[in-house]
Structure formats: structure tokens, C-alpha cells
């Protein structure tokens, strides 16, 4: 049998290993100069005014919602077709997530659906860039401006994506993930990009105990050692070990994303006319980051359902993923919002299957996956 092919694998090389070794030998391994370099180079790369590195995108979402004073009685509009962390943060702050449906093919929210969900209790809109494709930001910004609401982009999937020629994160506020499977990874980490000066100041405070400065500021930059807690905060800072990896990955991102794009195009060409339905591409100008390559497995079209296909592929040495089971179908949210019906979300949630896609894959790996999909379909035809 061929070697097992996972659905994702981090593209870590000698440069990342050397960067980590350098930090370990430096005597300063927690938040410090590598964080500062990461934030500075992220701003230079994507044109954002402020970049605040954090230990995860979830942490970034938490303190961003906190900084906007989200709490009991407030509503936050966001899709259910996303990872549950955003919904969890909204709930943990005592607010109510208003989950809306997504486009059946792109899995992203529309400005019209967002606007229809706005009430007097709405305090923030959190749309999600999906699988590497950017949202149609102009229309969403118009809705947010019309109703005087902050717009916080969940850009966990979208580092290196562009909408209408503009990098995701270049303006407004966007939250990125550097988790192990992301296009830019440092194992665990995240970053908040914003052009709001006051928000940036509060985020830096909230991410580190509510202190105005961190340990590196105090010990290395000669700032006042008696830092004061100005409000209760969290321990959401990123270590320099992680930041050093992210700095290298940021420099490599154009090449890493280009390889993802080439692999995705190979999939799209090979799967044309097959019963497996890739996600639709946005019909507006964009540059796709190809974080994930997903197909929808409809039992009527394919002769097999999603879960059965994933098991068959596993037996053939091919890993797959599910991104994601809709949040409102999870037990906590199902019990809490039993009447919620989101047809497009539910249709996709039952059929989504993530196929292997990572920069170190070969063209032959893609061909192997496509051949496996074809053989499953053919075996079902023969057995009928």
C-alpha cells in the first residue's frame, strides 16, 4: 500500500528549524523581538496599520469581542457554517450569536442576509472568509456603515487572499490563524490586523493580563518596570519560539500559496464532470488562498454518502477532513437553538469533505486522490 496521505501537513523546512534554534540559543524565548518582527513584517506585507500577535485566532476573537464591550443582551451576527470557536466566545461573553445561512456554493454570507438579521440588539457583524476565498467586502462594509456596526472579519482561512486587488486585513479589523494546518503556520498562533488605533491599544492590553507593557518592554527597552494593570486581561501572548516560525512562513507565503493554487487547479480540472462537487468560486474579482479543497458528497449523485466515502478513502491510505459540521448542529447549540433552520448550511454540513491539500504534495498525490475517488464510484457501479 502507498504511504498514508494526510489531508494536511505543515510545510516546515530547515529555515524554520534554524529560526527556532536561534531563539532557543538567544536567552529570550517568550514574547520579544521575534513578535515585534512578525507584527512589523505582517503590516508591511499586507498594508495593515496595526498587527497584534496572539496565541490563537480564538484568543484574538475573544479579546476583540471584549474590546468592543460585547456582553449580555447583545447580538452578534455570524454564520453557523464555521468552526465553533467564534460562537463559543460569543456565548462565553454572555451575548447571543445570531447564526445566518450561507451561499450554497461558496459557503459565505451575503450582505443582504446580514442586513436582514440586524436588530436593535445587534452590536457586531462577524463574517467568515471561507476555505481561502475572500468575502465580498464592499457590500458588507456598506451594510456595517449604514447601521453603524463594527465589522470583524474571521480571516482564519484567508492569509494571502485578496478581494478586488486588496489584501484581506489591509483595512478594517481581521483575525488570522496560524494553526498547524493553516497556509501560514507556527503550530499554534494567530494575529489581529486593524486600522483602529484605540482598538489596537486595548487589544495589546487585554492579551497580556491588562498590562500596558509586556516583559520584553520592561526588561529590554528600558520602560517603567512597575507596569500597572488598567483592566483585567488574559495570557494570550505568543512566544518568540512560535513567532520565529511565523516570520519565516510569512516570507515563504507567496510560494506556499502558489503551490496550493496549482494543486487546487489540478483537482478542479480532474474533477470536472465527476459526481463530486467542489465549492463554487466567487464571481467577483479575487485571489484565492486555497486553504482547503473541499467537495460535496451527495449520496444521490455519488452513490455513497460523505461519511462512507471518508472511510473508504482512509482504507485506501488517504486522509480527509470535515470543515465544518455546522455549529448549530452541535449538541450545545442544537439544544440552545432548537428551532434554527439554515437550509444551505445544513445541506453542505452533511456533505462536505476536505481532500488533501498542502504545499509539499506532488502532482502525483493529487492524481492518486482523484483516481481513488473514481475507483470508489466505479466499484459502486459494478456492484449494483
Swiss-Prot record:
According to its UniProt record, in which pathway does this protein act?
Nucleotide-sugar biosynthesis; UDP-4-deoxy-4-formamido-beta-L-arabinose biosynthesis; UDP-4-deoxy-4-formamido-beta-L-arabinose from UDP-alpha-D-glucuronate: step 2/3; Bacterial outer membrane biogenesis; lipopolysaccharide biosynthesis
Q: Which GO terms describe its molecular function?
A: pyridoxal phosphate binding; UDP-4-amino-4-deoxy-L-arabinose aminotransferase
What catalytic reaction does the record list? UDP-4-amino-4-deoxy-beta-L-arabinose + 2-oxoglutarate = UDP-beta-L-threo-pentopyranos-4-ulose + L-glutamate
UniProt keywords, alphabetically = Aminotransferase, Antibiotic resistance, Lipid A biosynthesis, Lipid biosynthesis, Lipid metabolism, Lipopolysaccharide biosynthesis, Pyridoxal phosphate, Transferase
Q: Which Pfam families match?
A: DegT_DnrJ_EryC1 (PF01041)
Biological process annotations from GO: lipid A biosynthetic process; lipopolysaccharide biosynthetic process; response to antibiotic
Tell me the residues on which N6-(pyridoxal phosphate)lysine occurs.
182
Which GO terms of the cellular component aspect does the record hold?
Answer: membrane
User: Assembly and partners?
Assistant: Homodimer.
What the record says about family reads: Belongs to the DegT/DnrJ/EryC1 family. ArnB subfamily.
- Do you know which NCBIfam families this protein is assigned to? PRK11658.1 (NF008658)
Protein name as catalogued: UDP-4-amino-4-deoxy-L-arabinose--oxoglutarate aminotransferase
Amino acid at each position: 500500500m502507498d504511504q498514508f496521505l494526510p489531508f494536511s501537513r505543515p510545510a516546515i523546512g530547515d529555515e524554520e528549524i534554524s529560526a527556532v534554534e536561534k531563539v532557543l540559543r538567544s536567552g529570550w524565548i517568550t514574547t520579544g523581538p521575534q513578535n515585534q518582527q512578525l507584527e512589523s513584517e505582517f503590516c508591511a506585507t499586507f498594508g495593515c496599520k496595526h498587527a497584534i500577535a496572539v496565541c490563537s485566532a480564538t484568543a484574538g476573537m475573544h479579546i476583540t469581542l471584549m474590546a468592543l464591550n460585547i456582553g449580555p443582551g447583545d447580538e452578534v451576527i455570524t454564520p453557523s457554517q464555521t468552526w465553533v470557536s467564534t460562537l463559543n466566545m460569543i456565548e462565553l461573553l454572555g451575548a447571543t450569536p445570531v447564526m445566518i445561512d450561507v451561499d450554497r456554493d461558496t459557503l459565505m454570507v451575503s450582505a443582504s442576509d446580514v442586513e436582514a438579521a440586524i436588530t436593535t440588539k445587534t452590536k457586531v457583524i462577524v463574517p467568515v472568509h471561507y476555505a481561502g476565498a475572500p468575502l465580498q467586502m464592499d457590500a458588507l462594509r456598506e451594510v456595517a456603515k449604514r447601521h453603524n456596526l463594527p465589522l470583524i472579519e474571521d480571516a482564519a482561512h484567508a492569509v494571502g487572499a485578496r478581494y478586488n486587488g486588496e489584501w484581506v486585513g489591509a483595512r478594517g479589523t481581521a483575525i488570522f490563524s496560524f494553526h498547524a494546518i493553516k497556509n501560514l503556520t507556527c503550530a499554534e498562533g494567530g494575529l489581529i490586523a486593524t486600522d483602529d488605533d484605540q482598538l489596537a491599544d486595548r487589544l495589546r492590553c487585554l492579551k497580556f493580563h491588562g498590562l500596558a507593557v509586556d516583559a520584553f518592554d520592561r526588561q529590554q527597552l528600558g520602560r517603567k518596570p512597575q507596569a500597572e494593570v488598567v483592566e483585567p486581561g488574559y495570557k494570550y501572548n505568543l512566544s518568540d519560539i512560535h513567532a520565529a516560525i511565523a516570520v519565516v512562513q510569512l516570507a515563504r507565503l507567496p510560494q506556499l500559496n502558489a503551490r496550493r493554487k496549482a494543486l487546487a487547479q489540478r483537482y478542479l480540472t480532474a474533477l470536472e464532470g465527476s459526481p463530486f462537487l467542489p465549492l463554487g468560486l466567487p464571481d467577483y474579482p479575487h485571489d484565492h488562498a486555497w486553504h482547503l479543497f473541499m467537495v460535496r458528497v451527495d449520496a444521490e449523485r455519488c452513490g455513497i454518502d460523505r461519511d462512507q466515502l471518508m472511510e473508504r478513502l482512509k482504507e485506501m491510505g488517504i486522509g480527509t477532513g470535515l470543515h465544518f459540521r455546522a455549529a448549530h448542529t452541535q449538541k450545545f447549540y442544537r439544544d440552545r437553538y432548537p428551532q434554527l433552520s439554515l437550509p444551505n448550511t445544513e445541506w453542505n454540513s452533511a456533505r462536505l469533505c476536505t481532500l488533501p491539500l498542502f504545499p509539499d504534495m506532488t502532482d502525483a498525490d493529487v492524481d492518486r486522490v482523484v483516481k481513488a475517488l473514481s475507483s470508489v464510484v466505479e466499484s459502486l457501479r459494478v456492484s449494483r
